[in-house]
């Protein structure tokens, strides 16, 4: 079995990575950078975002400040790799989103959206099926269930259970709206930067990274990908409990 290790280059994590390499070699795994069978993500949720987009099953080792979706403690690494070798694990599949703009396609694990970072609002048009709405504020995010535990939660204070087959449309700091989000079945949406009477430019973000800019009257499509992120589970993941603990509730 060939594994790739993904982590941030910090002194604390470098020690953990070396530990994983030694255990992997002892158990007969080959640690490589290309042509791998599995990805070992070492860190927190940010590292997991990078790992799932490599297209292989992920082993999620919790070694960061915030890792709500990481299930393997550092002191259980050898146990997890032994079980990987035996095939003793549960495979969980997670929804992925795609952002389409012109010829550009970007894959998102948590959320995709349009945001503004100037001290004024933008108006975003949202279209799906026969629905057409406009929301004025700092922007709009479209979130997966797992994404609702991240950026989306800071805007809505709500959580979608990870097994729910749905997406959440999140209104970021909306003006004059008490409604903060809408949960809908997995559908293709169009997000459009609407005209407020003068030109504006907004950021298109995928998992917290700016991937392109759009101008007034331009739009992006957000759709559910045919691909799934696969995370191998060795220990019970108590997402609700982790969220309550992380936010000291």
From Swiss-Prot:
Active-site residues, record numbering mapped to chain: 45
Catalyzed reactions: NAD(+) + ATP = ADP + NADP(+) + H(+)
GO cellular component, one term: cytoplasm
GO MF annotation list: ATP binding; metal ion binding; NAD+ kinase activity
Cofactor(s) this protein cannot do without: a divalent metal cation
Chain sites annotated for binding NAD(+): 45-46, 50, 110-111, 138, 149-154
Keywords recorded for this protein, A-Z: ATP-binding, Cytoplasm, Kinase, NAD, NADP, Nucleotide-binding, Transferase
One example of a Gene Ontology biological process annotation: NAD metabolic process
EC number(s) from the headed UniProt entry: 2.7.1.23
Family: Belongs to the NAD kinase family.
UniProt name for this protein: NAD kinase
Organism phylogeny: Archaea, Thermoproteota, Thermoprotei, Sulfolobales, Sulfolobaceae
Gene name linked to the record: nadK
């Amino acid at each position: 079995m060939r594994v790739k290790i993904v982590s941030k280059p910090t002194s604390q994590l470098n020690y953990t990575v070396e530990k994983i390499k030694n255990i992997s070699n002892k158990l007969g795994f080959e640690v490589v950078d290309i042509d791998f069978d599995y990805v070992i993500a070492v860190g927190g949720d940010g590292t997991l975002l990078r790992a799932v987009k490599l297209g292989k099953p992920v082993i999620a080792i919790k070694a960061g400040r915030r890792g709500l979706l990481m299930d393997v403690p550092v002191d259980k690494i050898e146990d997890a790799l032994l079980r990987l070798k035996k095939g003793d694990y549960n495979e969980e599949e997670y929804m992925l989103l795609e952002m389409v703009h012109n010829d550009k396609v970007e894959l998102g694990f948590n959320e995709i959206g349009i945001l503004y970072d100037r001290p004024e609002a933008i108006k975003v048009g949202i279209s799906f099926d026969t629905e057409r709405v406009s929301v004025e504020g700092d922007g709009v995010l479209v979130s997966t269930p797992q994404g609702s535990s991240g950026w989306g939660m800071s805007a809505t204070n709500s959580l979608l259970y990870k097994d729910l087959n749905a997406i959440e449309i999140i209104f970021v700091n909306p003006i004059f709206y008490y409604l903060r989000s809408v949960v809908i079945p997995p559908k293709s949406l169009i997000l459009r930067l609407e005209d407020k009477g003068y030109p504006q430019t907004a950021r298109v973000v995928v998992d917290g990274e700016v991937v392109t800019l759009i101008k007034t009257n331009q739009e992006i499509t957000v759709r559910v990908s045919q691909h799934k992120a696969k995370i191998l589970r060795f220990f019970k993941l108590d997402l609700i409990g982790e969220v309550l603990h992380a936010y000291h509730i």
